[in-house]
């Protein structure tokens, strides 16, 4: 049948870095007033998340890191995690000339982050030789692979 999806572009949002104030450890919500509050709600409501990022200089794009750092709000004082378990997670990367030797460690990092939150790894997809926004269109087989991965998420 299908699924309802929403594209969230971190680069279009105001996501401030965590200040380490630890207010979130007192049972209160994060005190930073930015777009992350809405993303906390979206993550809690989602059945699955596809985390996509271009890979720049052997790492995720800059907008990814403040987003991930703010997951600190889910960490309880005893280092357990207060987040609904069992949601599905897929990693998707585009990159220039790098390949699995660079991308696998990034994927492992994200798998660890999202597994800590209780997500279940549901796949990993990537395509190299993508330098411009529309370069992925040159790889119809990869687009079909991504569609199949999406169909698998809703099964």
Place the predicted regions along the sequence by residue.
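N-terminal beta-loop-helix "entrance" segment that forms/cooperates
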Residues: 7-29, 132-142
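Cofactor-binding loop segments of dinucleotide-utilizing enzymes, especially the Rossmann-like FAD-
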Residues: 10, 93-96, 127
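N-terminal beta1-alpha1 ligand-phosphate binding loop
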Residues: 1-3
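Glycine-rich phosphate/pyrophosphate-binding loop and the adjoining helix
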Residues: 104, 108-155
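Generic structural signal for helix capping and beta-alpha/helix-loop junctions
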Residues: 15, 60, 99, 131-132
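Helix-loop-strand module that forms the ligand-binding subsite of alpha/beta enzymes
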Residues: 31-117
